[in-house]
Amino acid sequence: MEITKTIERDNWELMVPGRIDGAAANQLELEVLAAIRAGAREIFINLSQAEWICSAGIRVLLQYYRQMKTSGKTLLVTRPSPGISEILEMTGFKDVIVEGGQSGVAR
């Protein structure tokens, strides 16, 4: 899996395609940590091309959502695919970590 980064000043967008399994969750975590260390104030995780996410992937999203929020910064999921949106809805996290709480929301 290749995560595509778009960086504009201190705003990062990470486009995550395919299935987010344990290995992909580790890769996502490394990319989020790199963004934080680089001074990102906003990190948007674009899941429009993601098909599925495991519990380790959800843990990464929640852990760094909380860390960023505590320091007055932002980490949000944007444009989740229907499958990802359904998983986040079932886990109760959709309204917490998804921008606008809906799939297909553009920044």
Language model regions located:
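STAS-like cytosolic regulatory interaction modules
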Residues: 1-52, 63-107
